[in-house]
């Protein structure tokens, strides 16, 4: 008999078991482990909740990827799954077969179910199955570890949604034996009180990405700093909208000192995004010097950088290996750009993405950074649109990109000579100027995706972040 035949028989046996729920529950301890996933899917689909509850207690794999089955929250099924786990946690001695360590609520492991489904099992060799079982059967060592529940948290409302509220309450009830692990936490509009409750529930070491879009209340800033300092594995920090109030110098210094002390504890931070946060103005040096590890990404956008802030950027080793730099909407019109040139020279070997969108950079300031920009040989994305730039300035800029052969996306403003008195593009004027710019560019290198003018093409509506069928989108026409 072939390997496929007994596999199919096992599936049929599992389906027949579900017709007799009492029998299915009674034989779970003797059920072959390879039958658990297809039987679980069948029970999930047919909503045999009591079977699911008992199957969780006998689950023979380290991870139960429930999130890839449950595309939308189902509180009834969640209650039964959690009840099954609670029954086990209440036992001093766990069953022999139970290996569950992780309840995965993110939609990240659909491959698990397809591998163990009939279609994929038919194509699996006995050797491959044996190898997979060997890896998953590795015994745990040491003391009993807490069960980990993995889920991402995106807070778009003032209050918690039902599934997050359910897990939060369960974790608080089972504190110590269950950890709520969230690699990504995003807060758009949740109130301070509810957000504090979330941060107190989530296991802080699990958070790798934290985005706060409403840092407008001073009390939130202070509260946030206290929790942030516990997130030792944080890799990405995004904070936005901290400019609602005019602060006294004492309050500003207090907030900067608070954040500085937090940054000292974030040893794994790699990406720092600061958007529309004005209390850093004039104090950026104090923050940058507290970074413990080299950053890969630095974004200071919609801010009001002072010249002293820009001067500090090339000084510190933590910014010497940048891959992404974004100073868009940074009002650089009245700031000397020699420090930016020094920073670009420092990161020329590593920089891959540079955003200088709508920074008020005219030709005189552009000339300051062009020599350094031309040495950024690994640059793949360069966005410069939104600046008031003449035709001569754009010609000079394009000629300086001759050695940037890795550029795959570049955006530039329409030349000033193609605009009306309200700053709107006149296509009849832009078309010949654009053709001339492309001719100059092709003399030094062959571009891939390039935009001149507004970010969205007025002819085809394409934005620079979309995949284009043609090599170029020059107002909807291949160049």
From Swiss-Prot:
Keywords: Leucine-rich repeat, Repeat. One of its GO terms (cellular component) is Cul2-RING ubiquitin ligase complex. LRR repeats lie at residues 15-38, 97-124, 179-203, 204-230, 231-265, 266-291, 292-323, 324-342, 348-375, 376-400. InterPro entries: LRR_dom_sf (IPR032675), PRAME (IPR026271), PRAME_domain (IPR050694). One of its GO terms (biological process) is negative regulation of cell differentiation. The keyword Protein biosynthesis does not apply. One of its GO terms (molecular function) is ubiquitin-like ligase-substrate adaptor activity. Belongs to the PRAME family. This is PRAME family member 18. It comes from Homo sapiens. The gene is PRAMEF18.
